[in-house]
Amino acid sequence: MQREATLGRSVSVRGPGMHTGRVARVTIAPAPAGHGIRFAVPGAGPAVPATTVPWIASRMCTALALADGRKLRTIEHLMAALSASVIDNAAITVEGTEIPILDGSASRWCGLIDSAGRVVQERPREVLRIRAPFQVDGMHGFLRAEPAEAFAVDVSTDRLPGFGVLRWAGPIDPASFRTEIARSRSFGNASLIWRTLLKTRLARTLLPAGTRDRLWARSFDAQTVRGDGPEPTLAQPEHSRPIGPDTDARMHPRDREPLLRGARPGRVAILLGGRVLGGARFPDEPVRHKILDLVGDLALAGRPILGRIVANCPTHALTFAFLTELMRHPECWEVVTLAEAGPGNAATT
């Protein structure tokens, strides 16, 4: 029987947030079996679970509503690293209101988790097994869950100017996540990021004379290194279930909040047409980062998902809607515990 796991010791990291630009310190500590992943902000009330219940709409990130009315923003990269590392229980303390962006990827989070070690606990590990296809669409994309013997994804996007269709498919496990997904970085449009830097009066400090020209000279053309194989095609939607009006109402931010104040080279992959300024880590880095975000957002199901996720142009809000509506259709899923030998032997709980 597979069992839950937590960290072997506490680990901490400090850094600025992508959107607020403010420095926060995050400590990830071991937690008892059955605890789940919970976030606490000193002075903001009780810790909140990393589930769809406290999820609150926030532009360009995933956020949780704190008891004092504030938001804890940009949890998705840390959640992806915990999920892909098979960590079920952790007590996370955040001295601030946004998780540090670090280098824009989940690589450093994975390194911290690996350095802490993984401790198996006594409680059987439950997973949410997909029994029947389930799909929602909206916001120019769709998400679909299909029955499968392991967690896998098939994600495509065609909404990045100059990149054409980008698509990546494969299983997600601790090894594949680290080698194929974790290093992919958050990305943003060059003009939007330059404008933000200018507005915050940081451009002269961060981008001294000649820097922009050097970045252009080192630009990486994703189209030219994709290879001579066939051009990828978009994943295709099937029968979709409607998003309920109450779910739809929660998908849209209702307040103004800081955006991209901490974005700069070294923390984000800056896109210009079909190029990644300064070089890309993968030819299809943007869609791989879409998968990173998707893995983190799907972790808000509260249990690991056993199934294949097919998505086109997924967003944080659409993934929230997908999980919320999926929970309303229990005929499409079941909660099971899995034998150590693999997913083929399961018991319904």
List each language-model region with its residue ranges.
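Short acidic-hydrophobic catalytic motif
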Residues: 1-349
